[in-house]
Amino acid sequence: MISTTRGALCAGVALIAALVAPGVSRADVIGDWNILAQNEALLIRPTAHGQTRGMAMVQGAVYDAVNAITRKHEPYLLDVDDVGAQPFASQDAAVATAAHHVLVAIVAPARVPALDTAYAATLAAIPDGASEDGGVAAGEAAAKAMLDARAGDGYMATFTPTIGPDAGNWRPLGWPATTGLDPDGWVGNLKPFVIQSTSQFRSKGPNALTSAAYTKDFNEVKSLGAANSTTRTADQTTAAIFWQFAPAPLWNRLARDLAAPGRFNLDTDKQARLYAMVNLAAADAAISCWNDKYHWGFWRPRAAIREADGDGNPATIADPGWESLFNPSTQTTPPLATPPFPDHPSGHGCLSGAVLRTFREFLGRDKVPFDVYSGRFPNQPRHFERFSLALKEIVGARIWGGIHFRTADVQGATMGKKVGFWLQKHYFQPVRP
């Protein structure tokens, strides 16, 4: 994945140099920098949530920089009166400066020269003068506000998970060995971007082991999620693997596609708001989700099915050799595995619920035809007619992969939708004339 990402980054730099037209405010510049940010975020840390945090920081700053010029909506962090940007200030310069300045502060030093080159290419296409200077000043102020706000936010803080030997307790593969623990356990204690607390949207929690609901979930994933399942369809297998990909590139690609000419044709101001809302919602959904995961500490289907003899439920039949579809023998790149963190709630359910709710609220409708692209199947997008139908498939996909109980998926999606709705109601409100 990393070699592909580096190639995409170089392509993104070339794209900016080739496509920016002098003296013209173009929505493509913000899309180009979204691509660069996405590809750089993948290199910040090769796990989902270093990427999620990085994208939220970049796109939140870009929004504030553009909004300091247009003043159409409430700012996220930046006091627009302190900036004093004029309406004629270059939005392109503001976008590039905000994105560049945040990125160079959070990426590895070796990545800075490529970002500097891209930044210079963007500015070279903008005529020198008060417009460019005003845009740069807005971008600098927005980046500083974001970096100041996120200083000491708990990124990469030491985290020790609770691991239990009892039925229902989560433990890593190979227990009692504790190798391969969650590299992103710190996420659940990260300072939120928009919600009031990490536990604001606490889920109802997993079903009791002796309940009929748990039995139903157990038997469903045992059948549909097994590596050698005879009940899972070929399309369900494809969908399960398709969705096992980092959320940041999935949803930012869709945001750019929806913003494009011929779709919703969003200008720079609207794109800035959409990208900020999508990535801030995803970040806080991840924070809420990981806090909830370690609050409940519930075992995944693999452990539950193998050790069902000890769960106190006579209706759940153990299979000591049961393996999920998500295991290294499944032919795909990169290899699949049971994730090294608790089942409940589903991370993809949380993030996808938040993002898809954000798209729906931003566009004012659920019925929007679109394609989603995954690095697992680069040339085989999955098509949906509604945002809600994509979320429905994601809920199913985690069961078909054998890594989640349905309750974890459903409650995760619900949590994510609550985060997205909260953001839409409390942030980015129009400024009254």
Residue positions per predicted region:
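Acidic/polar surface patches and capping/hinge elements
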Residues: 27-433
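Bacterial Sec-dependent signal peptides at the C-terminal "C-region" and cleavage site
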Residues: 19-27
